[in-house]
Structures are given as structure tokens and as C-alpha cells.
Amino acid sequence: MKNYEQIKNYAKKCISGEIISCKKHKWACERFLRDAEKFETDPEYPYYWNEEAAQSIVDWFALLRHSKGILAGKPILLTEWQRFRICQLYGWRKKKNGMRRFKKAFTEVARKNAKSQEEAGIALYEISVTATKNREVCEVYTAGVKRDQSKIVFNEADLMLRGSPLRKKFDVTKVMITHTKTGSFIKPLSKEDGKSGDGTNPAALIVDEYHQHPTTEFYDLGLGANTKEPLLMIITTAGVDLTYPCYTMEYTYCSRILDPFSDVEDEEYLVDICEMDTEDYGDLERLGNEELWHKANPIRMTYEDGQDKIRGEYKIAKEIPEHMTAFLTKCLNVWVQAQENGYMDMAKWKACQVDEIPINTKGMSVYVGFDM
């Protein structure tokens, strides 16, 4: 079965509930099916599906190797959830020139769901296949606040090449991975190193764990003006500071892109959010429903060791309130505002929102208090 049909079937299963999914992931599935219908029925629709391009990225990952765990050394076979997003990134094309439809991609999911592996595989693909196809030198940067963070994706790319038949196509040093044929390369950037990206010309920028970035410094680097197929890629987990741009800007904006009742449209931004729904973490009893953990863990909840580790984190969080914030953010991909000895329950916070003030306040005095 072709990737296109597989993705359509997957999307329908998520929407129907056959595959446990959160509201926003269902919205992402609905968005794909709407696009598919336009492609199939509307000759004026500006995008088309390129099955060969979609299969190419699937085959690419199969040539790379798992770097750790019980699958270490084995080919990377993309899961249904990974195909749903990655095949869309490369499969949807512009009719006017055949180039990629999506210039930006945002994925938010709980930890240990192969985020770094995905970013690394795509980075290697960009400096090899995409650079060769477009006959250009592609500069790809992995950006992180800390030095160690910026090198996570870089190091993962190195490890995934070990034992791979693709290894001979690349020159790997401690600071750069170079595709020998095109001269394209991957480099890590970090604020801690004093490398802000000034003077770079990125064809692709991978912002890792954006929830930790206090500013949009790397996000604002911009992509190379002369690049034929630029790509800004963000894969992150929820964080503990609601004033950071990942929450105030990206998560909020991307949620509106997915929301079918929103007037926000961005046809060149691929978005997927896998999180616990607000009604799922309002009380401990529902929070402990392991079936619901699948919503934020489309990969980790599919194998026993992953389930056991989330289960263990939950037991600790129940007994020690100080650990609840970490459990919600890292294991269930829920945004919280961290406080000393606790957390702000965002479900209750959002429940306070009203679209219209229920009483007539005209002429009334208003008093505002601040707890500094």
C-alpha cells in the first residue's frame, strides 16, 4: 500500500478513536484528510502528492541505524505516526515548481518518542538527497541554548550513520558532519558557545527542545535567501515557563492552525501536537488512566519498557508533589507554570476564560492587584 493511502487510513483510525489520540492530533489528521480531498477533487488546489518523494524519506531512514536500546544497530523503520508527519513533509509539493510545500514544521510530543532520531535523520537527508537534487550546498544547523543540547541531534546523526551503508558518503568530525559530494554540512549552534548563527546561511534550521529557549534568537535567524527548499524544524516537549516564546508564540499559533474553528490558515506550516487533553489531567484518578497516556506518547507507549518507565514516574509524582510538574511536562506533554513545591493547573486556569463578561460593568470601578 502506498504511503498516501496508509496515512489516510491512519488519520481515519485516529479520528474514529481506534487509535487513541488527543484532540489536536485528531485535528492534524482532519487537516490532512481535507488536503487530500482538495488534491483529489479540486484542479485549482496548488499542491499535489508526490509518492516517490514520500517513499524516498521512508527508505532513507531504513538505511540509518538505531543508536540505542534493544533496537541498537537495526534499521530504522518509521512508525505510522512518524510516517504521518514525515511523509507529509516530503510528499506534499507545489504544483508551480515541484518544491516542498511546507517550509516550517512544528511537532510537540512527550519525551522519549524518538524526537532526536527524527531530527537527525532529516538533517542528514537535507545535506545529502535534497542538496544533490537541488544542486546546492545546504547548511544545516542544530540550535540549542546549552552546548550539550545543541549537540544532541548532531551526535545522534553521527551514531545513526555507524553501521549504515550511507556512512561512506559523509565525513564526520567533532564539530561538523559533511556530505562529501555536495560539501553540505551539519553544525551545532549554542548560545553558551557564543555561536548565535550570525553570518550563517541556513538551508535548514533545527531548533531542539524549543521550550527551553528564553528568546527567539535562533528562531529569528531566518533561512538562506538563495535556498530552494528552506526548512525550519521544531520538535519539542512542553515546558515549565509560560512566558517563553515556545508557549506564547509557537504552541499558541500552531494550536490555532490545527483548530478547524479558527480563522488562522498557514498552508506552508506542518503542525502536529500530541498531548494529554485538559480533561485528562484534572484529577489524579483520570491522570492515572494508562490508556490516555498514549495521547502524548505515540511511540513510547507501544513497548513494555516505555510503559513501565512512565508508570514508575507517575507513582513517584503521586507520592511527591514536587515531581508532578516534571511528570506532566516530560511524560504527558502538558504545559505548566512551575512554582516552588507545586504547579499551576492549566486546565483550571483555562477554565477561568470567558469570551463575554457576564455582567454589565459599565461605570463600575475596577481594582487590580499584583502579587510580586
Named regions from a protein language model:
Residues 2-370:
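Phosphate/NTP-binding elements of NTP-utilizing enzymes
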